[in-house]
Amino acid sequence: MLFPTARRTGLAALAALALVPAAACSGSSAPAEAEPASAEVTAEDLSGEFERLESEFDARLGVYAVDTGTGEEVFHRADERFGYASTHKAFTAALVLGQNTPEELEEVVTYTEEDLVDYSPITEQHVDTGMTLLEVADAAVRHSDNTAANLLFEELGGPEGFEEDMREIGDDVISADRIETELNEVPPGETRDTSTPRAMAGSLDAFVLGDVLEEGPRDVLTEMLLNNTTGDELIRAGVPEDWRVGDKTGGGSHGSRNDIAVVWPPEDDPIVIAVMSTREQEGAEFDNALVSGATEVVVEALAP
């Protein structure tokens, strides 16, 4: 797929990309595991690097990355569960974009002051006027607006509907149970609102690089991810400056910090990366350097 070389932040540009009629999400393209690698980088190869980061940051770290050109993988605790926090917004937005026509995406969604939840920097400015469904999706992805995320959940039939839709695209791992902001409370041992790095990377791959979405909504989603405003210190900070990064971040209780991304090296095929982390202590804070450090290990392995 070819993507625009310049970043465009206006919703007018996003709307223009949406002119291709949207189709309901299909189950024909599963985000399943990457194709078998010819020269797989095993967990053992890099376990020392990732364990060093876990020790340095007193955290449990999960990583899965795949070079989509070679099938080469990097992984560490890739099948362990972590709270996904706000990274789900990439998927809820993708599903809403895929299930609505361009005309439906321009319909205004209304809400009240009572609907606002913590961290809603965009929706709190538009209570009186409402926002189009496209603007709601943009607020959720690019600004991680929590009220916008709940409006997307509502469009999908709540967490249950979201999970059902994810099953349709082939993700049989994600567990969706609560809305914002309760879904961010994921203590050790909790399985609600969790997934694994491998599954998160697979679903992002399916939405952005696969054929789960028609070209129009897929391009809109990709532009939103490329213009994300919350990820400068995470995966973006761990890759070379000339790489293009489309990502969605997340943070929650117990020092949880996540980032999922598709990254485009200048001369190579995209790499899909999911980094998830958490700590044992209830009041622990996250450290973005853990995510960027894990990304640096991935980059060194896949693009030395």
Give the ranges of each region predicted by the language model:
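Active-site SXXK
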Residues: 71, 82-114, 140, 273
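A short, well-structured edge-of-sheet supersecondary motif
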Residues: 42-78, 263, 273
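C-terminal motif of bacterial Sec signal peptides marking the signal peptidase cleavage site
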Residues: 20-24
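Structured C-terminal helix/loop/strand segments within mature extracytoplasmic catalytic/sensor domains
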Residues: 3, 7-8, 26-50, 155, ...
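Conserved active-site loop region of the serine DD-peptidase/beta-lactamase
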Residues: 199-251
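Acidic helix-start/capping segments at beta-turn-to-alpha-helix junctions
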Residues: 68, 106-123, 156-157, 183
